[in-house]
Curated annotation (Swiss-Prot):
Belongs to the complex I subunit 6 family. Signal peptide: none annotated. One of its GO terms (molecular function) is NADH dehydrogenase (ubiquinone) activity. It catalyses: a ubiquinone + NADH + 5 H(+)(in) = a ubiquinol + NAD(+) + 4 H(+)(out). It is a multi-pass membrane protein. It is found in: Mitochondrion membrane. Keywords: Electron transport, Membrane, Mitochondrion, NAD, Respiratory chain, Translocase, Transmembrane, Transmembrane helix, Transport, Ubiquinone. This is NADH-ubiquinone oxidoreductase chain 6. It comes from the Eukaryota. It comes from Artemia franciscana (Brine shrimp). It is an enzyme of class 7 (translocase).
Length: 155
């Protein structure tokens, strides 16, 4: 999972189109949320919803700015990416070819106790955050529907 995040961040350096950059940012956020779900499901869910809302607004804005641009892939720039990815795998995980159950990785059943360790104070904060984000979503929808024009013309 960490290797996929490193690979996506390497490819983000080579992207020259904003929509491809937005898509890779979305995939990277999704992978980080999947990694965080083992620690706390609520934090990963809230992080995903916040990033998804921001990325969707950014996607609408960027797609209205660059509607007819084509993707241009430069294959020569990928020649240095492959050795960098292999080296990053070797540095981040010295035994990435030899994964075994005795390598010290935690299984999802080890995190059951952590997931249920939510007290009433943090649940109240999560509830307020969810209500606040929902109200912000409703306000943005109402603002966009009241003008009945594209997002680009508002700027």
């Amino acid at each position: 999972m960490l290797g996929s995040i490193v690979v996506i961040s390497m490819f983000m350096l080579l992207m020259n189109h904003p929509l491809a950059f937005t898509l890779s940012l979305f995939v990277q956020t999704l992978l980080i949320c999947v990694m965080l779900k083992n620690v706390s499901l609520w934090i990963s869910l809230i992080l995903f919803l916040i990033f998804l809302g921001g990325i969707l607004v950014m996607f609408i804005y960027v797609s209205s700015l660059s509607a007819n641009e084509k993707f241009a892939v430069d294959l020569t720039s990928f020649m240095w990416v492959v050795p960098t990815i292999v080296l990053s795998f070797l540095v981040l995980n010295k035994n990435f070819m030899f994964m075994s159950p005795s390598s010290g990785y935690l299984y999802p059943t080890d995190f059951v106790i952590i997931n249920f360790n939510v007290n009433s104070l943090t649940m109240l904060a999560y509830s307020f955050m969810v209500v606040y984000l929902f109200l912000a979503l409703l306000l943005v929808i109402d603002f966009l529907n009241s003008n009945k024009k594209p997002l680009r013309s508002m700027i």
